[in-house]
């Protein structure tokens, strides 16, 4: 359903979107949908645009990756070299597909604010407390790492995307170092 329900577009000199590309991306993106009682298979994502390489970022011309703030919210742009690299190493804290689709979960309510749609009021209150700047500052500056760096940048959406990557890439570490945050993502 995910593969057939999206428009797949090759960009930046990529010759074609292959079945391998679709399955690799869909398999990782759909991890984010497991155990969710709500949401519609990334219904707002209409197009997945695949570029051959992240090195096209900042380039000029028709093959260049557009800047992140120029992406329409109905599109997910991915660099195939990064998708393959981050999919291979399950313990490097990075996953291109999970990060970009975490942003889509964040956008389900129309705002990229680090707060995905949560229907249960108790969960909403707990999420607000755990995601509050004070809690995050204490938790992540104490233990350092990528999340602390994202937090100091002051962008809750980036913190959510990076934390989601960490949840799938290194769940034991996240659970050990930040148990409340882990439970919110679970």
Locate each region found by the language model.
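Active-site recognition of the HExxH zinc-binding catalytic motif
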Residues: 92-109, 161
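Contiguous, non-catalytic segments that form substrate-binding/exosite surfaces or channel walls
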Residues: 1-59
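Generic beta-strand structural signal
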Residues: 46-48, 74-76, 94-95
């Amino acid at each position: 359903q995910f593969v057939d329900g999206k428009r797949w577009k090759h960009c930046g000199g990529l010759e074609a979107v292959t079945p391998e590309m679709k399955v690799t991306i869909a398999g990782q993106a759909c991890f984010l949908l497991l155990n969710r009682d709500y949401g519609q298979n990334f219904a707002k994502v209409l197009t997945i645009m695949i570029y051959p390489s992240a090195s096209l970022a900042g380039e000029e011309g028709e093959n260049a990756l557009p800047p992140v703030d120029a992406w329409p919210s109905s599109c997910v742009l991915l660099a195939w070299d990064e998708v393959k690299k981050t999919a291979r190493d399950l313990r490097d804290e990075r996953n291109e597909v999970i990060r970009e689709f975490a942003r889509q979960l964040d956008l389900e309510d129309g705002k990229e604010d680090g707060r995905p749609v949560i229907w249960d009021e108790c969960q909403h209150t707990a999420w607000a407390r755990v995601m509050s700047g004070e809690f995050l500052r204490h938790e992540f500056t104490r233990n350092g790492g990528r999340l602390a760096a994202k937090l100091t940048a002051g962008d809750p959406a980036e913190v959510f995307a990076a934390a989601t990557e960490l949840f799938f890439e290194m769940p034991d570490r996240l659970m050990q170092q930040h148990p409340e945050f882990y439970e919110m993502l679970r």
